[in-house]
């Protein structure tokens, strides 16, 4: 039996309310409790040199001694000096059992970067793990002493570095959302817990500064622990103390029931949330290490409500309690243990910002340890919850109170807190034995949210159908106050619903967004053409959308107006009836006068209600007319812009057409064959033989003919004619050149008034000025064009007359001209032959190489034909002489002419 020597000092130091973990030495002391506060059976204290995690026996026997009372209460909370003893490890279990012995040489064991995971909880509790050493001896790994392993200092340092690195990696990995914790309730059985890897050295156990719930009589004292790398600073020690008040029989019953429940849940494959018990509080530290969140800030961890007499027998060490409360703490604990009321237990924090209890049970320690299924319901704190349940329970709002709610609950009286959690959380969470029940429990919360959303949608739809009375009045009042650009949220909501608006899509909000809520020619800034176009597009869409539902909205508005009038009349009639029914009570003459006055007021109210309805309708119509007038102003401005651009483009197009005609008529002189053409034939054949000309030569100098905005008004169409004459073809024609001085004179005479008229126009952007100026120019250009064509015709006629006179004067020289024409024909034929030869040379280039050979062959063929002809004619004459008895009919001419021999040969045969 080992005494706990610092129990009074622990309570005295913890009673100050300091949220800090007191530590002495280099190692955090692990206090695994479950027996009395003063005496703990079956424990053994270890020195600092061992510095190892304790070995928990596989099968635990319940303590055979009755549990003693709590530590005395009336202690001074103002004690500042705290004397710390060497770190002690307090274990549960019977001292006589051989399984309670720990290993004597834990420091020399091999170091593993991961926690040792064994599946002993899946086997029978009596089975043990065995191994064979190098000597061949069988060793019980659970109960026997393990052989020493010699490890050098360098290996130890490497193992320590690997341990630290593995801790960091595992903590980062386990804090990921959706990661299923290895220490989830379904994997570690409370009856058989896995063995822990021992600490390697005091340095390694310094980083494992975790505190667990301790009884009030025990002391947790260690040096200032160095937290894990990446862990937040220490928040405080809020370990709560369950006060044991049960006997041996309850503990036995609890262990048996709990083993049965665990085996049942493991066989079913469910995740079961268990309440912490006295014998298996070592599992709390395991789950605490697995669920440690290095990224969790201590400010985000809500503190649990301060516990007191009604908090289920849990008393915080760091909160001072008055003496009477501590002395009378056993009575309410016994009551809650008997009644089995599930009460809340706030999450307590460890030294590194970790809640040391992985499962906050609703059932207290005062209950039997195996309090059936109801004891397994628990309220997970936000940080100590496994990632699986943490991911599942996003929607479990009532089951998991937030930080604000817990702060409020901490200020509430304990009775109200007990009622609240008994009514709400107790009724729901006490019935959730496993994950399936937890999911079933979450479903009603989601269904409630869905029903709430449906109700909200129904309300919104009803509001859209019904609407509010005269929604424009508040808007008008706001405009009268001088804040037309600022809208309240209520007005925007009313106009966005648009239930009773005559034109809901074209509202004041839309006009304000388009910046046309004021009259355009007045105070509003002028819009550009692009902005006007955008506004016009949006307004046209709004008009089109409103036209689809206009009839139905009118009928709906009239029906609602009639209903409102009928309701007002009914209310007034009821009021009048109630007053007339009480006429017997008006006995005094003054009362009678008041009665008559009330009746008159009711009649006035009738008339005012009717007038109000009609006036409201008129106000709505006028306001809508004002709104539509603003929209139509924008549309009219857009139409004017379109008209202006159309006229400008049309005038430019006509001017370019005229320039093209002038250029074509100037470039088209007399035809290439020398035959003069009339103006009509020339106009008909413009597109056929008109020579091509580059646009930059003929058209570009003419862009300043029309006085467009931004151009000099002094430019006139006629002074640009010299450019045309200079840029015309190189074929200078005498008629055209002779016609130019008259044209230039006409341009000077007719162009001056036009220049004066164009200069007198003040603003080129004015639409009427541009149209009149364009018309005047068109008329002048048509006149100039007709005059020019007349000059051309006269010159052509003069040329024709001159040509006829020349032909008459040249008539005696006709034979010479005929000879000349014959020579020209011959030259043309020779030129044709040359062209043929050239064509042959191009088509058949190899033919030119053998040209001489071809000529020689042709000459030889010609000679042969001549020789053959002569020889044939001579033979024909000789045959006729022989056949006609010596009479020769061939004359000398026939002998010479060999081609006539055939004819002469046929004549005697005919005779």
From Swiss-Prot:
Q: How is it modified after translation?
A: Phosphorylated by PRKG1/cGKI-beta. Phosphorylation at Ser-696 is necessary for PRKG1-induced calcium release in the cytosol.
Question: Which parts of this chain are annotated as the region Disordered?
Answer: 1-21, 39-122, 174-405, 478-498, 706-766, 787-829
Which residue stretches does the UniProt record annotate as biased composition, category Polar residues?
Answer: 68-86, 183-212
Instruction: Spell out the Basic and acidic residues composition-biased ranges.
Output: 1-11, 277-292, 790-801
Sections of the chain in a coiled coil: 547-645
Outcome of mutating residue 172 to A, per the record? Answer: Drastic decrease of PRKG1 binding
Could you tell me where the Basic residues compositional bias lies? 111-122
One cellular component term from this protein's GO annotations in UniProt = membrane
Phenotype when changing residue 179 to A: Reduced interaction with PRKG1
From start to end residue, where is composition biased (Acidic residues)?
A: 802-825
The record's note on quaternary structure and interaction partners says: Interacts with PRKG1/cGKI-beta and ITPR1/IP3R type I. Part of cGMP kinase signaling complex at least composed of ACTA2/alpha-actin, CNN1/calponin H1, PLN/phospholamban, PRKG1 and ITPR1. Interacts with HCN4; regulates HCN4 channel activity.
Answer yes or no on keyword Cytoplasm.
yes
* Highest taxon above the source species: Eukaryota
What does the entry state regarding organ or tissue expression?
Highly expressed in trachea, aorta and uterus.
Q: What is this protein called?
A: Inositol 1,4,5-triphosphate receptor associated 1
Using the UniProt annotation, give all residue ranges assigned to the region (Interaction with ITPR1).
534-580
Q: Which residues carry this modification: Phosphoserine?
A: 118, 393, 683, 696
Q: Where in the cell is it found?
A: Sarcoplasmic reticulum; Cytoplasm, Perinuclear region; Membrane
Q: What is the lineage of its organism?
A: Eukaryota, Metazoa, Chordata, Craniata, Vertebrata
Report which gene this protein is encoded by. Answer: IRAG1
**Which residue intervals make up region (Interaction with PRKG1)?**
152-184
- Recite the UniProt keywords alphabetically: Coiled coil, Cytoplasm, Membrane, Phosphoprotein, Sarcoplasmic reticulum, Transmembrane, Transmembrane helix
Q: What does this protein do?
A: Plays a role as NO/PRKG1-dependent regulator of IP3-induced calcium release; its phosphorylation by PRKG1 inhibits bradykinin and IP3-induced calcium release from intracellular stores. Recruits PRKG1 to the endoplasmic reticulum and may mediate the assembly of PRKG1 and ITPR1 in a macrocomplex. Involved in PRKG1 signaling cascade leading to inhibition of platelet activation and aggregation. Also mediates NO-dependent inhibition of calcium signaling in gastrointestinal smooth muscle contributing to NO-dependent relaxation.
The primary site where this protein sits is: other
Q: Name one GO biological process term.
A: cGMP-mediated signaling
């Amino acid at each position: 039996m080992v005494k706990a020597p610092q129990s009074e000092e622990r309570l005295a130091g913890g009673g100050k309310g300091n949220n800090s973990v007191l530590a002495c030495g280099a190692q955090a002391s692990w206090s695994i409790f479950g027996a009395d506060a003063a005496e703990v059976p079956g424990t053994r204290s270890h020195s600092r040199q061992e510095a190892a995690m304790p070995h928990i026996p596989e099968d635990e026997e319940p303590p055979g001694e009755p549990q003693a009372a709590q530590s005395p209460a009336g202690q001074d909370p103002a004690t500042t000096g705290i004397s710390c003893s060497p770190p002690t490890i307090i274990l549960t279990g019977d001292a006589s059992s051989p399984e309670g012995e720990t290993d004597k040489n834990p420091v020399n064991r091999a170091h593993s970067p991961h926690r040792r995971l064994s599946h002993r909880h899946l086997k029978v509790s009596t089975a043990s793990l065995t191994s064979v050493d190098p000597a061949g001896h069988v060793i019980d790994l659970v109960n026997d002493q393990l052989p020493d392993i010699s490890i050098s200092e360098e290996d130890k340092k490497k193992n320590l570095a690997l341990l630290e690195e593995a801790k960091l990696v595992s903590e980062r990995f386990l804090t990921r959302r959706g990661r299923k914790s290895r220490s989830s309730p379904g994997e570690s059985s409370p009856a058989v817990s896995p063995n822990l890897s021992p600490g390697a050295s005091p340095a390694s156990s310094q980083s494992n500064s975790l505190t667990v719930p301790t009884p009030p009589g025990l002391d947790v004292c260690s040096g200032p622990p160095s937290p894990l790398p990446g862990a937040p600073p220490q928040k405080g020690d809020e370990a709560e103390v369950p006060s044991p008040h049960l006997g041996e029989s309850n503990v036995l019953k609890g262990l048996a029931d709990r083993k049965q429940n665990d085996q049942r849940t493991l066989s079913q494959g469910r995740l079961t949330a268990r309440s912490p018990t006295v014998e298996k509080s070592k599992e709390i530290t395991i789950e605490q290490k697995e669920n440690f969140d290095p990224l969790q800030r201590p400010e985000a961890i809500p503190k649990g409500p301060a516990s007191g007499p009604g908090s289920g027998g849990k008393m915080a060490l760091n909160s001072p309690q008055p003496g009477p409360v501590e002395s009378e703490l056993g009575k309410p604990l016994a009551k809650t243990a008997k009644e089995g009321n599930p009460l809340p237990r706030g999450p307590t924090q460890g030294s590194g910002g970790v809640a040391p209890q992985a499962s906050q049970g609703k059932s207290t320690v005062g209950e039997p340890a195996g309090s059936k299924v109801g004891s397994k319901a628990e309220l997970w704190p936000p940080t100590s919850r496994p990632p699986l349940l943490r991911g599942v329970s996003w929607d479990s709002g009532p089951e998991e109170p937030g930080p604000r709610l817990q702060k409020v609950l901490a200020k509430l009286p304990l009775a109200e807190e007990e009622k609240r959690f008994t009514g709400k959380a107790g009724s729901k969470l006490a019935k959730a034995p496993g994950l399936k029940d937890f999911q079933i429990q979450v479903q009603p919360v989601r269904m409630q949210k869905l029903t709430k959303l449906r109700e909200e949608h129904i309300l919104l739809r009803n509001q859209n159908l019904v609407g509010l009375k005269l929604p424009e009045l508040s808007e008008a009042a706001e405009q009268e106050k001088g804040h037309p650009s600022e809208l309240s949220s209520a007005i925007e909501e009313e106009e966005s619903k648009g239930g009773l608006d005559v034109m809901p899509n074209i509202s004041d909000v839309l006009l304000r967004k388009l910046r046309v809520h004021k009259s355009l020619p007045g105070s509003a800034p002028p819009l550009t053409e692009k902005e006007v176009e955008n506004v016009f597009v949006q307004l046209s869409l709004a008009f089109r959308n409103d036209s689809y539902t206009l009839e139905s909205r009118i009928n709906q508005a009239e029906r609602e107006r009639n209903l409102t009038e009928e309701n007002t009349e009914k209310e007034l009639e009821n009021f009048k009836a109630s007053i007339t029914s009480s006429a017997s009570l008006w006995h005094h003459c003054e009362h009678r006068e008041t009665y008559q006055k009330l009746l008159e007021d009711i009649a006035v109210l009738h008339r005012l209600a009717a007038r109000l309805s009609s006036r409201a309708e008129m106000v709505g119509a006028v306001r809508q007319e004002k709104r539509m007038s603003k929209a139509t102003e924008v549309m009219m401005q857009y139409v004017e812009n379109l008209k202006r651009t159309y006229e400008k483009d049309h005038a430019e197009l006509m001017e370019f057409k005229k320039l093209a005609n002038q250029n074509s008529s100037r470039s088209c002189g007399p035809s290439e064959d020398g035959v003069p053409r009339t103006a009509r034939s020339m106009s008909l054949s413009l597109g056929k033989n008109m020579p091509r000309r580059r646009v930059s030569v003929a058209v570009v100098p003419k862009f300043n003919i029309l006085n467009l905005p931004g151009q000099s008004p002094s430019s006139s169409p006629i002074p640009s004619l010299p450019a045309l004459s200079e840029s015309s073809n190189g074929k200078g024609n005498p008629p055209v050149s002779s016609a130019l001085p008259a044209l230039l004179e006409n341009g000077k005479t007719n162009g001056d008034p036009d220049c004066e008229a164009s200069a007198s126009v003040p603003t080129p952007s004015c639409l009427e000025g541009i149209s009149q100026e364009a018309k005047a120019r068109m008329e002048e250009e048509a006149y100039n064009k007709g005059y020019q064509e007349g000059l051309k015709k006269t010159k052509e006629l003069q040329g024709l007359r001159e040509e006829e006179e020349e032909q008459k004067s040249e008539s005696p020289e006709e034979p010479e001209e005929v000879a000349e024409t014959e020579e020209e024909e011959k030259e043309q034929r020779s030129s044709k032959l040359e062209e043929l030869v050239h064509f042959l040379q191009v088509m058949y280039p190899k033919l030119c190489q053998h040209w001489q050979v071809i000529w020689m062959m042709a000459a030889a063929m010609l000679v042969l034909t001549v020789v053959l002809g002569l020889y044939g004619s001579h033979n024909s004459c000789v045959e006729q002489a022989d056949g006609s008895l010596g009479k020769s009919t061939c004359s000398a001419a026939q002998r010479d002419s060999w081609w006539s021999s055939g004819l002469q040969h046929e004549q005697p045969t005919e005779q």
